[in-house]
């Protein structure tokens, strides 16, 4: 084996490092405070997002996915921690809060809490099955009901670019779906994994051990990200933190294998701040790893949980 063959022995299909540094790969803007924490946005590879309980990592992930989809960039959101319906409701609510006051097709966008979605069958009237009457009813109702009105517009401007998948459990299936979409010329610009500890590899030898499974899932997600040159935002739970550690977030906080943090391009941990009030909670984004910028910085912002929205700190 010659030296050039040796150099190319484990060389990726796409020269990711060259793309990033020599060709100036631009980060994917999320138009959230994650851009500030990462000095610009999401780069191809894994960005790990962890958070203490109820700190808002799922809300931030939904906010990121919604914002990217709203700019007509495709997002694949894989979740085993939530359902398609809940993620979609949270995304519509987030979008309604961000675009409140705007008008689309004579409908004014009014923010609503994602928990306000109608779920009582007795509130739905018995309707004539005549298609023309149903169409007229739907048209009138979306002007009278803020949730239906927002959802109708969301369906046109955001939903076509956001795929929420809650029925896929292995990295093998994830890779197959993403490569199929890419082969059809519709590769996603962003992938979200919610969350890494819940997914499997599909190999019983690996999946029987929690440590080995999490390590291999993280490794395979990294390989997918690099081979497809796509940012993957991976949510991760945290291990139990000692009182003496709570003010010093680090890569060691991620639960399971150290591969979760060390295989990543960047890693951010969310903690709760002191300020809180009706419908909001101060949170802090701690940048514990960032190959494209500074580490150790803390970005303060406000979690508005009822809307799955992250706003400026004030």
Language model features with spans:
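P-loop NTPase motor core
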Residues: 9-72, 76-86, 95, 164-285
